[in-house]
Amino acid sequence: KMTLHEKLGQLNLPSGGDLVTGNVNSAELTKMVRDQEIGGFFNVKGIRKIVDLQRIAIDSTRLGIPLLVGADVIHGYETIFPIPLALSCSWDTLAVERMARISAVEASADGICWTFSPMVDICRDSRWGRIAEGSGEDPYLGSLLAKAYVRGYQGNNMQGKNEILSCVKHFALYGASESGKDY
């Protein structure tokens, strides 16, 4: 049975700091894993670092729960593909699925098990800065491509070693920004 501290720790998902400027206290992150104060990371890059953190989570904690390691794998990981808005112009769901599959293989090889993609906001104001992450203003096209992204990232049953979890984002009506404001 999990303690309250362990349950709260599982809800904590800090940035690992690899994709930010400035100093990152790796010793503090390691201590947080050992003390079961986190359930995962995002923005951690590098298989060695991720494997070391996973080993601590599994071997040095009471419950041995693996960490969720997430990243914004929006249009590729090591191989960079066109942005989602550009991909949507093709109406080619198979190409989108292949892109997501390649991205999943590359990200999972680096220890990533979760992506914050696809973005399914229906965007109607081209001034909004996040419009490039989505499929534009057509709900039908957006639904077809979202399905293709998820199939590509997750495969058929999430049993393969090269599959990653897909987290469809954002919130209802987040894409209905006014005057291009990101609120």
Identify the meaning behind each predicted range:
Residues 1-183:
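Glycoside hydrolase catalytic-domain context in secreted enzymes
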